[in-house]
Structure formats: C-alpha cells, structure tokens
Amino acid sequence: MSGPLEGADGGGDPRPGEPFCPGGVPSPGAPQHRPCPGPSLADDTDANSNGSSGNESNGHESRGASQRSSHSSSSGNGKDSALLETTESSKSTNSQSPSPPSSSIAYSLLSASSEQDNPSTSGCSSEQSARARTQKELMTALRELKLRLPPERRGKGRSGTLATLQYALACVKQVQANQEYYQQWSLEEGEPCAMDMSTYTLEELEHITSEYTLRNQDTFSVAVSFLTGRIVYISEQAGVLLRCKRDVFRGARFSELLAPQDVGVFYGSTTPSRLPTWGTGTSAGSGLKDFTQEKSVFCRIRGGPDRDPGPRYQPFRLTPYVTKIRVSDGAPAQPCCLLIAERIHSGYEAPRIPPDKRIFTTRHTPSCLFQDVDERAAPLLGYLPQDLLGAPVLLFLHPEDRPLMLAIHKKILQLAGQPFDHSPIRFCARNGEYVTMDTSWAGFVHPWSRKVAFVLGRHKVRTAPLNEDVFTPPVPSPAPSLDSDIQELSEQIHRLLLQPVHSSSTTGLCGVGPLMSPGPLHSPGSSSDSNGGDAEGPGPPAPVTFQQICKDVHLVKHQGQQLFIESRAKPPPRPRLLATGTFKAKVLPCQSPNPELEVAPAPDQASLALAPEEPERKESSGCSYQQINCLDSILRYLESCNIPNTTKRKCASSSCTASSASDDDKQRAGPVPVGAKKDTSSAVLSGEGATPRKEPVVGGTLSPLALANKAESVVSVTSQCSFSSTIVHVGDKKPPESDIIMMEDLPGLAPGPAPSPAPSPTVAPDPAPDAYRPVGLTKAVLSLHTQKEEQAFLSRFRDLGRLRGLDTSSVAPSAPGCHHGPIPSGRRHHCRSKAKRSRHHQTPRPETPCYVSHPSPVPSSGPWPPPPATTPFPAVVQPYPLPVFSPRGGPQPLPPAPTSVSPATFPSPLVTPMVALVLPNYLFPSPTSYPYGVSQAPVEGPPTPASHSPSPSLPPPPPSPPHRPDSPLFNSRCSSPLQLNLLQLEESPRTEGGAAAGGPGSSAGPLPPSEESAEPEPRLVEVTESSNQDALSGSSDLLELLLQEDSRSGTGSAASGSLGSGLGSGSGSGSHEGGSTSASITRSSQSSHTSKYFGSIDSSEAEAGAAQARTEPGDQVIKYVLQDPIWLLMANADQHVMMTYQVPSRDAASVLKQDRERLRAMQKQQPRFSEDQRRELGAVHSWVRKGQLPQALDVTACVDCGSSVQDPGHSDDPLFSELDGLGLEPMEEGGGEGGGVGGGGGGVGGGGGDGGEEAQTQIGTKGSSSQDSAMEEEEQGGSSSSPALPAEENGTS
C-alpha cells in the first residue's frame, strides 16, 4: 500500500488548458502526509455530496491544494487527505483546468481502474463516469476501513481517514513481519521432525486437552504447525472465549490472531528446541503440574465477530509444548507447537485474587527503566510483562509520588542494598486508574564495581482501582509522554546510583563477596520477612571464607600493598586466640574483609557475634540468581589467579622466613598479652586457632580455611600477588600447592608452644572439602557444581601432598628461634615499607628508614643445619643458618657443626618454602649464623661471603652468592613467559652492576680492605662444590642450568638483592654484581638453590650473612633464616613431573646462542622505520639519528637514593647498535639503586671495601657493557674485572 502512495509529483500540476496525463504522473505523497486546507473529514463527506458540504475549500483553492499535495509529502498536519478534498472541491466548483487535476491523480494512483491510459480529451463523458465510479468505490472502501478502526486509535483532533489509512498500513506491515517472524521461527530450528516426540492424531489430541478445558472454562488449546505456521487444531472453547465460530480459525495463521506488539514475543518464546515435549499419556493432574512449571508467554488474542466495529484483544497466558500431530491418516506427522491458552482476568473481579496474594515483584535499572516484571503483575495492573519492559518506572507512578523514588534510591544507597519497607505509592493501571501499593525495596550491589546494579521492588496491592477491570482500554487520551520532571528525576536517580556503595556492615553489601544480604532478594523487602532490621544496623561479623581470601588477593593485586596493610590494621586489638577458632571479619568501606587480620578476636565479641550469627544464616533465604551467578563468576576468576600462592602466603608467620611475618602478626592483632604470646607459629600452626574450628558453616578441622588464622607476610602477599600471573614454571605452581598441603596437615598438630611432632599429614586433609562450604552464599544457595569445583580445587593439594611423601617427622612446630614472640613496633615499619617496595617491582625506596634495630626475644642458639634430603615436605627446603643472637649483643659462640648433615638444632620451620615471603635484602640482610657485628669465618659448608677469618666450624648451609640473582617474585616485569627473553636482555646489563655489592658486609659495618673482601671468593667456590655433596646436592646439578639463567636474567628484586645489598639492595643491583664476583657468580650459578623459575626466596640464602656481620647492630634488622624453595624436593621427583625445559645442564655458549636466536626472532617483530621516517624523526629528535635513548631517559642514576651516577654513554657499543635495530633498550631502572640506602649493592655502607666500589662500578657501567660479555660473565662467573665494565666512582654510597 505504501508503494503506490509514496513519492512526489515531479512535474507539478498541469497548466490551465492542457490535458492532464495521469499515466505520466509519478505517485504523489501518501495521503496521510498531505497538507490540506479545511477541517478534517472525520464526518466523512460522501463522494456524491455536492458543493463543499463538510469541506470548506473554495474552488480557487483546489489548484493550490493540488499543488501542495503533489509537492509536499511530509507535513501530516492532522487534516484529511488532500486527495479527497481536492476530489470534492473539483466536483463542487469548476477549476481553471478543464479536467480536475487532483481527481486525475486520485483515480490514477489510488484506484485500480483502467484509466491508466492517457485520456484522449479532458471532457470525455465516458472518462468522467469511470472516474466517478472509481471514486465511489474508493469512498466505500474507506468507510468500511473506518468501521474496523480500533477505538483507541480514534483520537480527538485526528482525521478519521488519515487514522484509518495509517492503521491499514500498519496492518500490512504487521502481516509482512509475521511472515518474516515465521520464516525465522522455522529456519532457526532446522528440521524439527528429527526431535524424538510422540505423535498424536487430532482425535487423541482433543481427548487429552479436553481434560484441561473441562477443568478450566477459560482455557482452550491450539496446535500450530512449525512448518507452515498455521493452526492445525483448536479446541471448541476457543470459539466461546473469542466469540467467533471455530471454523474461522482453521487454516489461519496463528500469528495473525495475535496483537501486533505480541507477535515477536510469541515467536521468541516458542523456539522449538527450547520447548518441553508434550509427554505421552499426560493426565490432567500431571499435565497441570507440568503446566505450572513451564515458562509461559503472555499474548493478546484477537476475538469478536467480523461485524464488530474493531478487533478486541483479550489477554491470555500461553504455555507452549512441542509435539507431533498427524492431521489425517495418510498424512505424515508434522511438528507442532501445542499451546494451552488460559484467559487472564482482572485480579479484582471474580474469581478475585485474595488480598494477601496480590503481590508481585519488579526489577529496574539505575536509570529507572523496567528490567523485569513479575507475571503476577498482569492481573493486578492490566499490563502484560512485555508492556512494561524498557519503560520508565516514573511514567507509571502518580505525579505526586514520583519524588518519593529519589528518597527510595537514596536509602538503597545508604543501606547498601539491604531490603527495607517504604510508604505506599500509587501505580497507574492499564485502565487509567491508580492502584495503591505497599512497597519494599532492595538493591543489588555489584561485587566488582560496588555500585548498585539494579533495584528490586516487592509490591503488595493495598487499594484496588475503582474500575476493577484493569484490562479495559483507557479512555482515549494523548499517549503518555516523558515529562521534563520525569526526565530530570530519572537523571538524578541515575547520578545517585553511580556512586560506589560503602557499608560498614558485613551483610550490608547485598551480594558483595560471600557476605550477602540475608533478605530474600528474589522477593525482597516484604514487611514481614525482609524489613530493614538487618539493614539498619551493622550485622554480626561473618566467618572467614575462602572467597574472602580471594578478595584479599584481588585487593592486594589491584590496590597496592599499603592499602592492604592499612585495611588490615584497622580492626580493634584482640587479646588472645580463641579456641573456637571463629574469626570474624568486618567489611571496611572499600576493602575486602581480611580474615587473617583478626587472628585473635576478643572472646566477648566473638561469642556475642557467633550466637545470633548462625541462626540468621540458616534463616536467610538465598540471594537472587543474578547475584549468585555474578559472584560465582568472580570467584572463579579469582581462583584462576593462582590462588594456591595466595593461600600459601597466609601461613607466613609459621615459616620463620621473614621477620615481617611475625611483625605483621603484631601489627594486625594489636597488643597481645605476653601470656598469650606463645610462639605464634606454634600456636597458630599447632592448630590452636585452626583445629577446634567448630563453626557449622566452615567445618571442623578444615585446613585451607585455617590458613585464615595465620598472620601473613605482607611482603609475601604482595610479591606473590604481583608475580602470580607471570610465573609459569614448575616452582611457582608446585610450591604453593605443597605449602597448602602442609598447611592442611597443620591443624592436626598438638597445641602448645613446645615443639612437638605433628600427626601424619594425611590426617587433616579429609575435612578440607567442608572448608569451602560457602559461608556467605549459604549451603542452600550454592550450586552443586560450584561445590564440586571447590572440592577438586582442594583435592589437587592433597594429591600433591601424597606425591611429596610427607611424613610426620618433618612437621615440627616452630622453634623459639623463629622470633614469633613480641616484636618491637619498629620492625613493623619495615614490613610495611618493604611490602610497599616489593609491590612496585620491588624497587627499594631508601627514603623509608631501614635501620631500626629489632631486638629478638629469642635466646641465641646454634644454627639450623639442613635436615636430610629425605625429610618430608616442610623440611624439604633446607633451613639456612638462623641468626640466633641478641640484636645488639656481642659475638655469641656457635657450636661447630660437622659438614655432613646433622639433625637441625631447631626443628624445620613448618612452612619453610614460603617462596613469596621473602623480605628484600635491602630491608633485612640475609641471615647469618653470627650475631651482628661479629666477623664470620669461612665455613666448610657454603660460608657467608663476609667472613674474614676462615674457620671451618660452621655447618655447611648451601652457600648463597653475595650477588645472587633477584627473585622474580619481587621484580618480575614480564606479563607472560614469552617475554622472559626480553626481560633477560633488559636485565643483563643491570646484573653486572651490583655484584660488588655481593662484596661482603653490609654498609653499616666497618668496611674491610678490598683484599679481605676478595679473598674468600675462591674458597666460596670450593665450598660450594663441597656443599653439593650434602643433602642439597641432589638438585644442584639439575638446577645449575636454571641458576645460570637466573644469573643472566638478573631479575633484580629487592628481595633477592646481592649479598652486599644488605639493607640497601635495589631492584637493579640485587643481581650478582661486584668486583669480587668472579667466584661469587660461579657460586651463584652452582650452589644457589633458588631460581626465578621457581619463584624462590633468593634472599633466603646465607649470602647476606656477611653483610649482617659487617653491619653495626644498630643499623641492622634481624632477618630470619630463609630456607630453600620447595623445588629442591622436586629435583628428586620423577622426570615427568618436571617441565620440559628442565633439561640436563647446558654450557654457556649454547645458552647464549639460543638467546641470540630468540633475539633475532624477536627482532622481526620490532617496528621499523623507513629511511624517510628516520630522516623526518631525526630532524626533530637528535637521539633518533644516534640510535640512542634521549638524554632525559638515558639515566642510570638511582632514582630512589638520589645518586648521580650517569651512564657514560654507549654510542659506540655494538650491543646498543644491535639494540637499535631491535628497538630494545636495557632497563636501567636500577642504575645505582642497587646499593639501596647504602649504595651500589654494597649494603648500607656501600659494599665491603673494593667489593662495594666495584658494585658501584658495575652499576654505573652496566649500560655500557656488551651484552654478550655480560651474559658470558654471568654464565661462567666471569670476573668483575671484565674489560667491558669500566670503573666508576663509588658515588652511590
């Protein structure tokens, strides 16, 4: 219809006296869009009426009207169509033209008459009679169309003819749309006949469905073919309900019976593949049960006899099924959609919905658009769900109640989504009257963005409308429009809900993390079951959950270590550990709850909180599906972020690896009475806080959640978090898991401070699956799938534990030497600052004081000789000599230990391989067996390089090179293993610089002559070789290659700074660098038992012992002995356990060759400039012509300590000419930084003697070293006097 009616008359009206040729005139604009003079033709002047009856147009206006009608197609001014007006005006008065032009246009364009032939003359009587006949037929058709115009379309001030034509056009479009929908419906599903379903004849189908229709007189059944879209069967009740004969429906398209706006909803809800199959032998009872469970679709179906003035639509609830129907005996069965249609009555008419059942729920977006409407709203409001979806909420509220919505949303924000009741509001029903409803509201706070994602409303009708038939069409009135106040109010609410939610209540954040609102959010806020009681005040603290641990990890990774520490320090001090083991966490406004912070909740608080807590949790109904789904996906994401590492790090305090562990214990737990200060590791690990966990939600002696009791090392959390996504090697995966295995066993340990062997490690893991019973989500809510995932998550650790072959002999509580007793507050600052540094690529910030002495409450004892290699897991990482001495005390004799392995004077720390718990050397010098300030004698075992007077009386801990490579845990800058090659290239120049720092002595101590500092190096090499014969030697051959790569990559981390980095080792200088490093580098590659591939504790080596020995006690910080990483045991594991790249040792030449090949391969991926581009850039930037970095960037000075060591330049160095081609430049962030506070890797004092100077020399000149020379030197332990390393002033000290 639109086709022939659209267009414009290109030629305008014919000039007077000229014959008009309708055949050559293009189609004029659609009649409904014509501007026309005179009033509307709503009174419908008949075609035969003469003059201007009902039409005020004069004769002289006909031509102007014709012109406007032919030249204007877009002005729909609500008047009648120009076609009819010009037709009548031309009949009433003679126009200047012999033939009425507008009549010609009308006849030629709107009628299917035969006058498309050009008329011979304008006054032919036969032609005029034909036109009059066509015009009469046209008016008759229009009159009939107007009878079928729906009442709601007959608005005031609108032309009846225009509205009729517009409605006819809409109907045509709807028919076309129906066909398109149907084609999509049938094509999407492929061949429906392939579905396995029962086949019914029409008689069988009628017999089955009659049980429904007899039970409910407002129900009928209809079957629609999926192949043709036509009705193949309809029950007799359809004619009664729709007030028409049953035969009218046979063969008709079902979509043509639906209201146009419901056709898409119907097709979208009846996709064949998603429909339930109509079961064989479905009885009325069973079928009705299925019917109530199936997803229904609401549609309006046209009814009423043809003679009615317009179609009347009645609302029905359609429940679709899929089945096969055989129309006749010989015809094949065809798949059909069987619909059970139930008419919907107004809830206020008989049969009425009881007043206490007039409840429905809604959900709307922060911008106040309906997102979901409960189907129970249909009989109460008169709207079908699809009528409200996407519509503004405020549009349906009484104008006086709209401002209340702003207050409602403010309260939602204040209560963090908690359900609450609100005063009644008036909602406009479909019939135009208002329904008064009691409302309750709740908001869902997105756990990720902490913003209100959507608002849930629960509404109970209090007052019914005066007109109880809510489905009655409203009195014709202008369509509701968005008033300016509605728009403004919606914007205010939207801006309000853009704010993140802050709540001090654990249960305040509806759905954030595991702590979710106890209110029933799928039916929120009823006055009886979810009033604001819980929301108003902070709820009781919730038990620690695994999900909270995940959130802690996320917090640390993304918000920084300092914020993490501060959030942990906020809870009030708790006097002692509770035997109940209930550790509650309170959600801070922006921080996640930290279980381990509140290791010792006060008994009164815990007991008071626990009593009401459990009943509430049991009573609380689960949150909505959207909440659970959102949470589960987030938790799965967090679990994928290497959760084993994070969980492992919760055990920091037990590992005696870093003083920060116990520091943070003190810092977080607050002042702990001395009486309660049994060895923290003993108390925690022995299960004092973990074993007796009786909470029904968390479960008994579940171990991984027991980890929440452990104070963690802040540095460990930070470093591991920052590195967990980059480590890809065996060590970074396995040690965390095995650590957790060990922790699973810990709850079985006997309580008490005294060391006692723990029971077999296989005792505790069994309850572990209960550990992950969701605390916040409640058992009733979490899906079985999630529980299985969590159990599998734990089972991996248990399996690994069996692989490790743990036995009880190795699991011993921490000895007194672990320094878990009271620790002065001074040390806490180091934990914090150190944690912060290790967070930011572990570049030391010397501005943070690093000299506070921390007295150790533990009496001095002999060092810890490494336990046998067969020791079960906790002792797998051989303990290094523990610095057991008073911080400022004088030398204390240490009992000589034989070179062979001897039982540990101190029991092995339980969680020794906490690889991430490393404290950077610049904060805590590597532990030594000697008290501070006491010179160490070289030992047969790997001696600490700082020893001045050789004495073979010390036990043989594996020697730690003074310049050993930094642990990537603290300085990894690679985001994927593919970037390790690039990282090594960047790091290699830096690794040359700080090895002199490996020079003995921490900077605070007296600097011995350079000869003394260089002397021990050859011995160290020999000692290393001899030490390889001990329990540690099993892995030395295998790891030699890895350590060589360590030495090459020199991922200088503050934690693994070189020996001399003592208190000041920087990220750059931490690598093996230094004058007396030739032997040391060899040691580092041969005897160091840590590797960047395993995320080990580089600073755990005894390398820094000498640094401590030389440092004045006042400038030292006690550093716990760090043990070897767990991969030592892995070296003895089966070959298939190891990664493929752990091949037999390779020589340096092959390694360098492979590196160069990788660089060449990477070179192809570097951007290249054409010569023109180079010239153009060179004209602007001179450094482009030289192929060097700009002067502003080419700086090797220590950023943190302010040293001015500058790069002498490398314009002539072949390495950098090659780098120019690659587009690479060595990372020079660590320039003089290696010294940290003390300067170039020389510890606080700038390195020991010449060692310190050479450290500075190499730091300052690393930029100018040849890459090959640097790599070869690092691989082969090249001497520090490499010609590629010119000397420089020791300016960093």
From Swiss-Prot:
- Region called CRY binding domain, residue ranges: 1145-1293
Q: Give the region (Required for phosphorylation by CSNK1E) as residue ranges.
A: 596-814
Question: Locations of Low complexity compositional bias?
Answer: 48-57, 64-115, 513-533, 652-661, 1032-1058, 1074-1091
Residues that the record marks as modified (Phosphothreonine) are T121
Chain positions of motif Nuclear export signal 2: 489-498
Pfam (any one): Per3-like_PAS-A
From the record, which residues define motif Nuclear localization signal? 823-839
> Main site of residence?
nucleus
Q: Where is the composition biased (Pro residues)?
A: 750-768, 856-870, 952-962
Task: Report residue spans for region: Disordered.
Answer: 1-134, 509-544, 647-697, 748-771, 808-870, 935-1094, 1204-1293
Query: What does this protein do, in the record's words?
Result: Transcriptional repressor which forms a core component of the circadian clock. The circadian clock, an internal time-keeping system, regulates various physiological processes through the generation of approximately 24 hour circadian rhythms in gene expression, which are translated into rhythms in metabolism and behavior. It is derived from the Latin roots 'circa' (about) and 'diem' (day) and acts as an important regulator of a wide array of physiological functions including metabolism, sleep, body temperature, blood pressure, endocrine, immune, cardiovascular, and renal function.
What is the protein named? Period circadian protein homolog 1
Q: What is the organism field in this record?
A: Rattus norvegicus (Rat)
Its gene name is Per1
